[in-house]
A protein has these predicted regions:
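Conserved alphaE helix
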Residues: 68-69, 76, 100-104, 108-162, ...
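Intrinsically disordered, low-complexity regulatory tails and linkers that flank structured modules
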Residues: 319-395
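Conserved N-lobe ATP-binding subsite of Hanks-type protein kinase domains
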Residues: 35
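Conserved activation segment of eukaryotic-like protein kinases, specifically the C-terminal portion
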Residues: 185-200
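Conserved HxN/HPN-centered segment at the entrance to the catalytic loop
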Residues: 79-89
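Activation segment
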Residues: 171-173
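Conserved N-lobe beta3->alphaC-helix segment of eukaryotic protein kinase catalytic domains
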Residues: 47-48, 53-78, 93-96
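C-terminal lobe substrate-recognition/regulatory segment of protein kinase catalytic domains
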Residues: 248-294
Length: 395
């Protein structure tokens, strides 16, 4: 037993430095993926990094497949608008940690995430700055043969110089169009509920890049409303909110939707008219931006705007990069969702979410639970991840 312990202590992981080379400064994130820390290089005392702890749910099964996939994808995706993986570090196995090595993914540090910025009432994005954020987000999407599958404001990092970095590829996977008429069988247990597109909510497993474009549309709208525009508590409720905003989900507007697994099992509101422009107009002052949102938040994924057409849309003409740098330079304190107070319920709620509230008592209960929703949402995603792991094939 003593020999085994000594072997574990002395074992050297090639190409994997010890995590002790970095000094943790503060915890800046926590979720289904584990924890994220701001840290600095002990040697230089200057270089700042982000360290993402790999969550070992079941160490008997070895290194998590989701972490392996994330590492592989990040090694392939070297792009200005994708977070940069610097290295993988590990702690030394000793008696004090029960001979369990902890691994960290080490990234270039980004000062803010979009959810944290939107939580701060003192951060005000101009139209040009919103254009610049969306242009960079769509640039991150257009390069992919990858499905990100977790588009949300908290996963959009922004540096102090205004450069956007898409982060958290823990649910991402390589994408290819189905061959020989055999459909893909991807898991639909992905994407945080408030940003999940209707095809996934209805059980589609043969999906593609449009799932990320729906999330991009939700993020774009959120930059004006300052809160997620559809805040359902269940998959059924999320579909109701989508129907109330985008119109009834029927084969007439979405051919083939009735063949999806959950189409007949969900209660889908009837006689709902499409109201995307009507609902967003009070917040989105630019008519071109409102038109782009109308093209991104489309029920039928085959009719949803793709990254290329969205980038060429009139609404993204002449974004103001320098202005966003000046705006962010005014805020020296980092802003992350984890460190921010809960955002108030979205402005959109009174307009198109009334049907989701059953009675005043339920409404009050929802208000009381609102502050706990982020943690509840994280628990849901953990459950989805655990349920779907067998379906997530290796690269």
């Amino acid at each position: 037993h003593a020999q085994k312990q000594k072997y574990i202590e002395d074992y050297n992981f090639q190409y994997c430095d010890e995590a002790s080379k970095y000094e943790k400064i503060a915890k800046i994130g926590q979720g289904t993926f584990g924890e994220v820390f701001k840290a600095k290089d002990r040697k230089t005392q200057k270089k700042i990094v982000a360290m993402k702890k790999v969550l070992m749910d079941n160490e008997k099964e070895g290194f998590p497949i989701t972490a392996l996939r994330e590492i592989k994808i990040l090694q392939l995706l070297k792009h200005e608008n994708v977070v940069n993986l610097l290295e993988i570090c590990r702690t030394k196995a000793t008696l004090s940690n029960r001979y369990k090595t902890t691994f960290y993914l080490v990234f270039d540090f980004c000062e803010h995430d979009l959810a944290g910025l939107l939580s701060n009432i003192n951060v005000k994005f101009s139209l040009g700055e919103i254009k610049k954020v969306m242009q960079q987000l769509l640039m991150a999407c257009i390069i992919f043969t990858i499905l990100h599958r977790d588009m949300k404001a908290a996963n959009v990092l922004i540096t102090k110089t205004g450069i956007l970095k898409l982060a958290d590829f823990g649910l991402a996977r390589p994408f290819s169009f189905s061959k020989n008429s055999a459909p893909n069988r991807y898991t639909n247990r992905v994407v945080t509920l408030w940003y999940r597109p209707p095809e996934l909510l209805l059980g589609d497993r043969n999906y593609g890049p449009p799932v990320d474009l729906w999330g991009a549309g939700c993020i774009m709208a959120e930059m004006w409303t300052r809160s997620p525009i559809m805040q359902g508590n269940t998959e059924q409720q999320q579909l109701t909110l989508i129907s109330q905003l985008c119109g009834s989900i029927t084969p007439e507007v979405w051919p083939g939707v009735d063949s999806l697994e959950l189409y007949t099992k969900m209660e889908l509101p009837r006689d709902q008219k499409r109201k995307v422009k009507e609902r967003l107009k009070p917040y989105v002052k630019d008519p071109f931006a409102c038109d782009l949102l109308d093209k991104l938040l489309v029920l039928d994924p085959s009719k949803r705007a793709d990254s290329d057409s969205a980038l060429n849309h009139d609404s993204l003409d002449r974004p103001h990069a320098l202005r966003s740098v000046k705006m962010l330079a005014q805020h020296t304190q980092s802003m992350f969702e984890y460190l921010a107070p809960p955002r108030r319920p979205g402005h959109m709620r009174p307009h198109h979410q009334q049907a989701a509230v059953i009675n005043p008592t339920a409404a009050r209960a929802q208000q009381l639970l609102r502050r706990k929703w982020l943690s509840r949402s994280s628990i849901l995603v953990v459950a989805f991840l655990l349920l779907s792991t067998p379906a997530l094939c290796c690269l």
